[in-house]
Amino acid sequence: MKPKLLFEQLLSRQDLSSDQMQEVIHACMTGEFSDVQIATFLALMRMKGETVNELTAAAQVMRQLAHKIDLGNPLIDIVGTGGDGRNTFNVSTACSFVVAAAGIKVAKHGNRSVSSRSGSADLLEQAGFILNLSDSQVQNCINQCQLAFLFAPHYHPAMQHARAARQQLGIRTLFNLLGPLINPAQVKRQVVGVFSTNWLKTIATVLANLGSERSLVISSQDGLDEISIAAKSEVVEYRDGNFKQWFISPEDYGLKHSSLDAIIVDSPEQSLHLIQSVLSGDSGPARDIVLLNSAAAIYCAKDGISFDAAIEEARIAIDSGKANLCFNKLRLLTQTLNKESNHE
């Protein structure tokens, strides 16, 4: 599709067909479009608003171009779209250790920051984790720690063609929405946080279109892309072919309604400090938001468990020291695996 025709169509607020969307995403991902053309496309899509069909088609192309990894199933991913502009610490990354410590295998798909102050990869590298691992090393992480981090650039090398355009734009784009939809381990269960309640049903429907067995898509009424401690959060749950809407407030589960101020960070260092505090058992707003969001993943991963019981499992995973042990064990394992591969 010629860029000029594409831009005219989007300027007139006409949606793209699935075929058109696949063609355009392929052009973006193979270097056919220039940085300016990619940025223009992303900005116009943002202005028009991305549809279920467009996102499904885009994710299908991204999955086809990805380097896939088979880590077995069941697996879960906990991920946010970002783009909420709130600069909270890396809640979903912290939750990964808690959920793994609760006995659930987690394939956490993440990247460096594009529009926030601390992406999951920025945080993990600050903590000393080695992210550039081979497939067999990643499998080793899952086997030994129930958790592996899938560094997006390694599995989606085609994304390099859009990186400059995304960084120069510096705003939420289509790719924030796509990130949670293209886990290279092809997880069947996911908790996805989105930056606006307007996107809940859209993202849940796209996940269903892409073969998800069960998903929770979450957004809080204060604009956080996860369950909030400062406001009611809305959930669209997909399970057994059906969608269900429900709400979560911290008070419903014996947790305090708190300001977000205590969980705002300016850097990966600050985010790491908060995560280590939570995993060490410290109480406060950071712990509460990790409990709520870890519980969402445990609830999504386990059949027949209540949300109350999931919160208790998350609490035990932290207070027993298992979540902190998972953090330290996985960090050491990634370092050891990296040294071994360097000596081969």
UniProtKB/Swiss-Prot annotation:
Residues the entry annotates as binding 5-phospho-alpha-D-ribose 1-diphosphate: 80, 83-84, 88, 90-93, 108-116, 120
What pathway annotation does it carry? Amino-acid biosynthesis; L-tryptophan biosynthesis; L-tryptophan from chorismate: step 2/5
Q: Which residues bind Mg(2+) 1?
A: S92, E226
Cofactor requirement = Mg(2+)
Catalytic activity of the protein: N-(5-phospho-beta-D-ribosyl)anthranilate + diphosphate = 5-phospho-alpha-D-ribose 1-diphosphate + anthranilate
Q: What is its EC number?
A: 2.4.2.18
Q: What GO molecular function annotation could you give as one example from this UniProt entry? A: magnesium ion binding
* UniProtKB keywords: Amino-acid biosynthesis, Aromatic amino acid biosynthesis, Glycosyltransferase, Magnesium, Metal-binding, Transferase, Tryptophan biosynthesis
What InterPro entries does the entry give? Anthranilate_Pribosyl_Tfrase (IPR005940), Glycosyl_Trfase_fam3 (IPR000312), Glycosyl_Trfase_fam3_N_dom (IPR017459), Glycosyl_Trfase_fam3_N_dom_sf (IPR036320), Nuc_phospho_transferase (IPR035902)
| Residues noted as binding Mg(2+) 2 in the record, renumbered to the chain | D225, E226
Cofactor comment text: Binds 2 magnesium ions per monomer.
User: For anthranilate 1, which residues are the binding ones?
Assistant: G80, N111
* Top-rank EC class of the record's enzyme: transferase
Picking any one GO biological process from the record gives: L-tryptophan biosynthetic process
Q: Cite the Pfam families for this sequence.
A: Glycos_trans_3N, Glycos_transf_3
Question: A cellular component term (GO) from this record?
Answer: cytosol
Q: Which residues bind anthranilate 2?
A: R166
Question: Of which family is this protein a member?
Answer: Belongs to the anthranilate phosphoribosyltransferase family.
What this protein is reported to do is described as:
Catalyzes the transfer of the phosphoribosyl group of 5-phosphorylribose-1-pyrophosphate (PRPP) to anthranilate to yield N-(5'-phosphoribosyl)-anthranilate (PRA).
The subunit structure is:
Homodimer.
Descriptive protein name? Anthranilate phosphoribosyltransferase
Origin organism is: Legionella pneumophila subsp. pneumophila (strain Philadelphia 1 / ATCC 33152 / DSM 7513)
Its lineage opens with:
Bacteria, Pseudomonadati, Pseudomonadota, Gammaproteobacteria, Legionellales
Instruction: State the encoding gene.
Output: trpD
